[in-house]
Amino acid sequence: NHIISCGDLLNKFERQIVLEEDCFVSPNYYDFAFKSLTFYNTEKKVAGISLYSYLYYESFGTVFTPLIDGYDTYFMQVPSSLGQIWTKEQWFGFKAWYNTNPEIGENDKIPEKVKTWPENSWKKYFYKYMVENDLFFVYPHIAFTTNFGDTGTHFPEKTQIYQVNIEYYEKGKSYNFPQFANSNNKYDSYFEILPQCLIKRGLKIDPDTCIDIMGSKPLHLFTNIY
């Protein structure tokens, strides 16, 4: 697996930016990478930082729009594969888990389509790793990478579903990063906002509520009261 091999280069380095050949980057991607790494370097809940920003729930086929809360980033239990950043600690936390030869089964709380991905998909296992360990990726509200969806290994036909607007501010932007503990903008592996975030925003719901606005969750896997 190419990404596993790339991640293992962190044996020699402290931090890593992974860009596949079909990614197009913002001129400021490195500035964001440096500043976000500096800010989240010691946050134990963060499993990686994304340069991409999803507008499409890829494993279900619906539009996704995170809440705009005045910050430049939010958190999601979805691994990024269209431009991602890892520290040595983040990568080898995953790798130690991966080396136990985990299996993905029908009862795992990850999107159903993800479960059908090939066994050599690193992303499939990173999904499960994040859910099992309650970890999150940091995502920018405005992307620093995009993908043109040209025909190739992953796209048998040209597609535009991964094309997004990319950031193009003046250099030296001061980013407004939220602390994980204080953020009310966190999403689960099904691109659904966490109930505690809605409660903090004033919505009167039980903390043990299963949020399934897009209808992608196999509800028999969830034992929530609501």
Regions found by a protein language model. Name each.
Residues N1-L19, C23-Y226:
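Peripheral/terminal regions associated with large enzymatic or DNA-binding modules
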